[in-house]
A protein has these predicted regions:
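Short functional hotspots where side chains directly engage DNA or cofactors
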Residues: 209-213
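Core catalytic lobe of class I
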Residues: 2-208
Length: 213
């Protein structure tokens, strides 16, 4: 099996293409991930800061990428971040491999990235799939959490750990997998809850950031 980039009692990080590493990982209870959207995103927020493009974020490459990843996933729950112009494809493709359970809405409270000449998106969507069930009382499908402040952001599309912790805590998952790990927010959330976490990231700089978290 490929040697981990980093490993401790709770977290294992692999540096590489998830399509190469996923076949080497056994079943997990939860896949929680934010894959490339396919929008060629380049952050231009802040002078001289955060201008690097996201790897594999071209539309055709991204679509081909996640379609090749889905058959490799073996999980009870899948929570898959997406956006308004990508979710129909995600819904259809994810539904070929897992029973679909619905869409969650992340209400950010303020507009996010996008074309400044049109409406600013203040939400993201999360496709929920799998045979598993939530733990405890039934929650609503709208999650209200502010975005990570730009000054503390370590990845262009970083998600708040508090929100990810809420999602992980609601599912009976001893092991959480994020095949598009980014800066490791999902792994941080899982570790804080005492869960095992596996992350895969193609860019080494983000593996290093995640390992330090």
């Amino acid at each position: 099996m490929s040697e981990p980039y980093y490993s401790d009692d709770h977290v294992t990080i692999y540096h590489g293409d998830c399509r190469d590493i996923l076949p080497l990982i056994g079943p997990v209870e939860l896949v929680l991930t934010d894959p490339p959207y396919g929008i060629n995103y380049v952050s231009n927020s802040g002078a001289g800061r955060g201008t690097a493009p996201i790897t594999n974020d071209g539309a055709r490459l991204s679509l081909r990428l996640y379609r090749s990843v889905l058959p490799l996933l073996d999980a009870d729950h899948v929570l898959w971040f997406t956006r308004w112009d990508a979710w129909p494809d995600v819904w259809v493709d994810l539904g070929q491999w897992f029973p679909m359970r619905g869409l969650l809405v992340w209400d950010k409270g303020s507009p996010g990235m996008g074309d400044l000449r049109h409406w600013g998106p203040s939400y993201e969507l999360i496709a929920s799939a799998g045979k598993g069930q939530i733990v405890g009382s039934r929650d609503g499908s709208v999650l209200r959490y502010p975005t990570v402040a730009p000054a503390g952001r370590q990845h262009p599309t970083e998600k708040p750990v508090e929100m990810l912790s809420h999602l992980v805590a609601k599912l009976d998952a001893s092991t959480v997998l994020d095949p598009f790990m980014g800066s490791g927010s999902t792994l941080r959330a899982a570790k804080d809850l005492g869960r095992k976490a596996i992350g895969i990231e193609i860019e080494e700089r983000y593996c290093e950031i995640a390992a330090k978290r």
